Amino acid sequence: RLRIVPSRKEIHGKVIRPLPAHRDTWGSGIDAQINWWLPLYPLTDTRTMIVWPQAFRQPLPNDSATWDYDALISGRHTDYPMLPSTRTPDTPGRPIVIEPGELLAFSAAQLHAGLSDRSGVSRFSLDTRTVWTGDIDAGRGAPNVDAAGQTQHWEWFTPPTEPGHTPGTPGAGQLSEGISQ
């Protein structure tokens, strides 16, 4: 999916913010999920994504136990949070500055956030998520240190070569993020 992070805080009267600190596993509930991120234009350490490597195995208070994807997409609550929330760690995050066309793969359990600056330059990147069913079938995945959601959102992923494959059943393949998400 194409992600655009404007350098302005407001566009057409809407407040636009980069995504705050979060783990994607808080929403997906899938510990074996891998995120792929590719910038399309040059980055700076103030216009990029940041990660907190030291928080990978550190539990963080969050509201993943009560956050509900179905409530988000229902549109009934215009102020419903886009993702589970936490308090940003006191330690500084590490900015990711890679070249356009380089690809960053990282665990969905990695705490990360978006950054934008007032340079007037918007950030354009491509991101997607994948799950290898062999990892699921073998019980492999990142340590779940603090995700408390009760639902695994397999509907976010589509098997590219094995339509209808359900984790835990015979067959192996990579599940990639669905177009409709």
Which ranges hold each PLM region?
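Short acidic, gly/pro-rich beta-turn/loop elements at beta-sheet edges
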Residues: 12, 46-48, 59-61, 116, ...
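Generic recognition of flexible, low-complexity loop/linker segments
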Residues: 24-25, 92-94, 112-115
